[in-house]
Amino acid sequence: MAEKRNSRPPRNPGGGRKAPSCPVTAYARAIVDGKIVAGRLVRLACERHLADLKVGVKRGLVWDGAAARHAIDFFGHLRHSTGEWAGEPFVLQGWQQFVVGSLYGWKRKDRLRRFRTAYVEVARKNGKSVLLAGTALYALIADGEPGAHVYSAATTRDQARIVFGEAERMVAASSALQSRITRTVNNLA
């Protein structure tokens, strides 16, 4: 039996508001609405995001949804290099989209990024190194900053090398990245 097609988009089943198309805002709304359980600091970050969408302009803040989407979409061009997901495209989870999108989507009125640093705390084996490697590669080649420099720092060289090694493997798995990034001893340029 053929399904009827409606010329207008369906209403949001949760009410009259149209569901946000931006994954950053959708995640923030889900947290604030209690659809996703989160800690106090995550809830506050999501509340801040939603409030700043309304009144951020008065404080000199601009939401650049296209920049957020560009950063999030970049990760789809990367591949996992180890573990059960090896070889699969890197699809960001909602919380990861919120982090990456917030970092690159929020700008000051002078169009410079609002956030220069981020503190992300998650349990072991939850993809911190992969997320950081992808973010580093984005900053290196896709953020549009001429002559960008990206550093991997940690308390030990071995720890810093984990993120570098992950980025290196991501480059090796992508012919598009290989054409833009050259590996030298302990460097990706």
What are these regions (language model features)?
Residues 2-189:
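Phosphate/NTP-binding elements of NTP-utilizing enzymes
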